[in-house]
């Protein structure tokens, strides 16, 4: 998150220094919606993510880009999202609040030139009161409109609006545990609730008779269907909509009562 209200540490406050630049790009302080801790290195991310974040922050500060003020709802730079996969694909989404076409294009080109390894470079103009982009237009500046992850020989498409586990390596172990708990014999009807891009649904499909996935975000369901087709999986069905509206008695009468339910906790 970009913010012009940088969170000062206790050490910085006690230093009696004057801080002329309060711009920050990092993570929100718990319980302080308008304060952001400036981050130089996140140890949970690949180093390329740190390089991109630091480069974008430096460029924006040097070229006079305004950082978002959540209270006043003003400023150009809003959020930065970086996603990478185990096969080396890299997605970067820059979210602007105020739009200045010249500055926007200059920044996007700077990112593209500085980090040619980015496989999907996207941007969004989000002038809403909240940071969600699921209802916003995602514009591809350079490269593909999605990235791909691989798991047990399966390939999964991950779009900018699609949820995928942030820790790809651990996600594989999580899915293994879910599959083992399900103890599938090949004859079961499985419901995968809040299926996202259908990664778990497709992951267990080879061990089940049929898998039905339900997800609120329509674009994620499109990815789920594409993932099944790409991996030649024919025993999955996916539906987009609100769970409380879709998963009713009529739905169960049509598709059958599940033997196993996998659900997002």
For every predicted segment, state its role.
Residues 102-265:
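Rossmann-like S-adenosyl-L-methionine
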């Amino acid at each position: 998150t970009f913010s012009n209200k940088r969170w000062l540490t206790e050490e910085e406050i006690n230093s009696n220094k004057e801080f002329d630049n309060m711009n920050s790009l990092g993570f929100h302080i718990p319980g302080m919606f308008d304060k952001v801790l400036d981050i130089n290195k996140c140890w949970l991310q690949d180093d390329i993510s740190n390089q991109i974040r630091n480069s974008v922050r430096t460029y924006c500060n040097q070229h006079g880009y305004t950082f978002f003020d959540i209270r006043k709802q003003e400023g150009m730079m809003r959020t930065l999202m970086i996603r990478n996969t185990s096969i080396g694909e890299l997605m970067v989404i820059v979210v602007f609040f105020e739009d200045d076409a010249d500055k926007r294009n200059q920044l996007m080109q700077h990112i593209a030139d500085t980090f040619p390894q980015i496989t999907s470079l996207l941007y969004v103009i989000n002038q809403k009161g909240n940071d969600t982009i699921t209802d916003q237009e995602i514009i591809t500046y350079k490269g593909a409109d999605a990235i791909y992850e691989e798991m047990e020989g399966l390939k999964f498409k991950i779009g900018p609006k699609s949820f995928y586990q942030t820790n790809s390596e651990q996600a594989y172990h999580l899915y293994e545990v879910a599959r083992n708990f399900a103890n599938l014999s090949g004859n079961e009807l499985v419901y995968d609730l809040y299926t996202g891009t259908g990664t778990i649904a497709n992951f267990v499909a080879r061990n089940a008779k049929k898998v039905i996935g339900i997800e609120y975000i329509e674009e994620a369901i499109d990815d789920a269907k594409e993932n099944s087709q790409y991996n030649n999986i024919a025993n999955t069905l996916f539906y987009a909509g609100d769970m409380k509206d879709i998963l009713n008695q009529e739905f169960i009468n049509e598709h059958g009562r599940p033997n196993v339910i996998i659900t997002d906790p």
